[in-house]
Amino acid sequence: MGNLDWNLALELAEEHSVLGVVAARLKETGYGGIPADAWEKLQSSMRTQHLFSLSMTAELFRILDAFGQASIETLLVKGPIVSFLAYGDPAVRSYVDLDLLVRDAAILPACRILTALGFEADVPESAILAGKIPGEYLFKRAGAQQLVELHTEKTFRYYPRPMRIEDLYARKRRMPLEGRDVPALCLEDELVLNCIHGAKHFWERLMWPADIAAIVARHPEIAWERVRQAARDVGAEQMLHVGLMLGESLLGVAVPAEMAASANTDGAARELVRQVEGWLPTAGYVPPALLQRAMFRLKMGGGGLAGTSYLVRLSLSPTEEDWAEGKEERGSRVWEAIKRPFRLMRKYGQDG
């Protein structure tokens, strides 16, 4: 590694949100070969990441306590849970927010609790009362870098078919996190959710395939028939295959034997993997153009009628970005749906 440009390597790792993973692997080798200036830069970044993780964990416990007192069931997804599952440490994987899943019926009291805890709501209560569904219910703490996102079965619109939230709650488990057990999805459901989440973001950063590969490698106990059924229930078989194939092609983690037969015969998934490999080096800085995005969504949704239905629904389902300013509670949903494709054309219409 004598000719390696360490500053560039660390910069790329940061852009792909895998700096913590790189640091953990270098630690295993005793940081052999890394120059002093690069080592100091890496250690500084890791200290910052660990302090952030600790502050977010403390905030999480406050929220869970408040939700518990109000009898609001919630599940922690992504973020520190994925870091623990994939790397054995909630602080290894970088994340910017806490993601909590609650039932749609509980979203109003859950939002009010976060407001009472000092968070500022990005989605006004008037919009919730009007029945509008954002992409997520985002909360920010003024003067801090703490973000919380509430999700429901209705905001997870990137599921090809509706999320079966009661099934997820029925299979939930408690996981250790910094000395305390927290409510989480079962291992198989978390894996499927993260494949869907990676597909949502076009797998633009190495972080998402790395998570899938690490979870598969660390957990031989995964019940693959349960994974397959969970993906089938929500129409996400293609997304699951792509996630597993990316783990194999990019990280060298073989597609599990239990999944190999279906994955290896999935030509559409292999084509999608090649597409991802083409744009992955840019780490999302050169996003796919509009038509490329549309075709990717169509194929990721299963192709044919199912994929077309998935693409049309995503194209015509307004989020908070489509709501008219000051009319969050009154805007015509039909008009918002009509405007959405034009907004997407303006945002992604230019090639690259």
Where in this protein do the model-derived segments appear?
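Conserved NTP-donor binding/palm subdomain of two-metal-ion nucleotidyltransferases/polymerases, i.e.
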Residues: 1-96, 102-352
